[in-house]
């Protein structure tokens, strides 16, 4: 009888635990219940991992196609609508870049299908060096070029990618639901300037060594959080200014940014984490190669950096959230950047400014922008609104050096631009920002 008396309470306790485990999840708690749910937001995503092992992007020394998959690659879309019905679509890609021709084709289709003006489309790439080659030239390859398997694979993949991007953008628009937006930023410390210290005299033992711990960095982790009116977290758009180059193997992977997104999503069913690359043209993750940390592989380093970044995003989402209200305003223009060699035609370079009411200004620049741009733009636009600066957006045409780097020389200065491109680009940022005031 005593044994039965003991078994019954234990059974009841087990039943209660089972009911608790199988019951409704705890009620959502808003991080900022005082902020009006004045937006509509929608998310969608698609796997964009190549279906076959084609050539990889990022490292010129690669001599064969991919051989495996460490992680799926994704395209993700966030659609936002303010109270006046103005919409913005943001697309992030776990890929090397956003070819300008691809961006223009997607923009034209979204305008035709959904009435989204080209200025209200942002496309950003993580710049993972463990993704596929893309067709970077705007025109389709010729029949002769298509005889080359590498060219043919890149073109076929890029065509399929375009269809998936258009599809997820449309799905995100269809998913528009009432939402509350908040933002803030945290810090993450693994990004370091990868250029040598040009202030050291020739002959100094460290004159030609990188990284440069004293070099300029932007280690901010901005995060725009989206939650339902009831307080349930639906997604986050977050950024970091650093190359995705922990890895050098022959497997598909999103690198540290892919793992940061995975970690943010894994314990939140239905949650979408989207990574936006900052001005990381001269920034690398450190440590970043096997042997630097005994017993730790490249993949483990990518995962560790991903965890560090995800932890910073968690802090940015939860610590002192700043309410974001409308209106939504966006401006986009392309400026003409000349090359040193006059026979080379100038390049149309995209500059975009998106203002989220009076709370946040997002500046996006094309291609591999060095960190000087982010630091300068944040300094010059400083005011009541937060300032977030992204690179690798809407274009992929090589490195965009600052005036300082053009003067110093080195890897990031070798693209061949004429001088003063920094003044042209930053000047356009100020013009667009002033237009939206």
Model-predicted regions and their roles:
Residues 6-7, 24:
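General helical structural elements
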Residues 7-16:
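Bacterial N-terminal signal peptides
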Residues 26-124, 128-280, 284-310, 317-437:
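Conserved beta-alpha junction segments in alpha/beta enzyme cores
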Residues 1-4:
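Positively charged n-region of N-terminal signal peptides that target proteins for export
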């Amino acid at each position: 009888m005593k044994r039965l008396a003991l078994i019954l309470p234990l059974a009841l306790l087990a039943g209660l635990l089972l009911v608790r485990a199988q019951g409704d999840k705890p009620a959502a708690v808003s991080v900022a219940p005082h902020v009006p749910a004045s937006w509509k937001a929608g998310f969608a995503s698609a796997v964009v991992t190549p279906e076959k092992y084609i050539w990889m992007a990022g490292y010129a020394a690669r001599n064969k196609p991919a051989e495996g998959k460490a992680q799926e690659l994704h395209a993700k879309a966030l659609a936002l609508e303010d109270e006046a019905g103005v919409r913005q679509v943001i697309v992030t890609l776990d890929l090397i870049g956003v070819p300008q021709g691809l961006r223009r084709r997607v923009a034209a289709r979204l305008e035709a299908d959904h009435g989204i003006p080209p200025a209200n489309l942002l496309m950003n790439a993580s710049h993972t060096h463990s993704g596929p080659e893309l067709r970077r030239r705007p025109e389709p390859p010729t029949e002769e070029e298509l005889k080359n398997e590498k060219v043919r694979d890149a073109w076929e993949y890029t065509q399929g990618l375009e269809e998936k991007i258009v599809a997820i953008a449309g799905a995100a628009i269809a998913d528009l639901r009432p939402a509350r937006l908040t933002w803030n930023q945290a810090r993450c410390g693994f990004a370091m300037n990868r250029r040598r210290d040009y202030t050291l005299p020739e002959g100094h033992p460290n004159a030609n060594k990188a990284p440069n711990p004293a070099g300029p960095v932007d280690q901010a982790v901005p995060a725009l959080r989206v939650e339902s009116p009831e307080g349930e977290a639906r997604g986050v758009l977050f950024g970091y200014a650093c190359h995705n180059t922990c890895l050098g193997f022959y497997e598909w992977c999103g690198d540290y940014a892919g793992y940061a997104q995975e970690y943010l999503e894994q314990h939140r069913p239905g949650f979408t984490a989207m990574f936006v690359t900052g001005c990381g043209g001269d920034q690398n993750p450190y440590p970043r190669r096997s042997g630097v940390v005994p017993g730790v592989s490249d993949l483990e380093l990518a995962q560790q950096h991903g965890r560090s970044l995800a932890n910073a995003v968690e802090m940015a989402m939860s610590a002192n959230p700043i309410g974001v209200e409308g209106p939504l305003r966006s401006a986009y223009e392309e400026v003409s950047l000349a090359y040193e060699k006059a026979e080379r035609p100038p390049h149309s370079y995209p500059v975009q400014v998106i203002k989220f009411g009076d709370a946040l200004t997002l500046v996006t620049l094309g291609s591999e922008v060095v960190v000087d741009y982010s630091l300068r733009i944040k300094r010059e636009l400083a005011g009541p609104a937060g300032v977030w600066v992204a690179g690798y957006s809407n274009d992929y045409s090589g490195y965009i050096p600052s005036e300082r780097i053009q003067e110093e020389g080195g890897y990031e200065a070798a693209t061949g631009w004429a001088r003063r491109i920094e003044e042209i680009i930053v000047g356009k940022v100020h013009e667009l920002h002033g237009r939206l005031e």
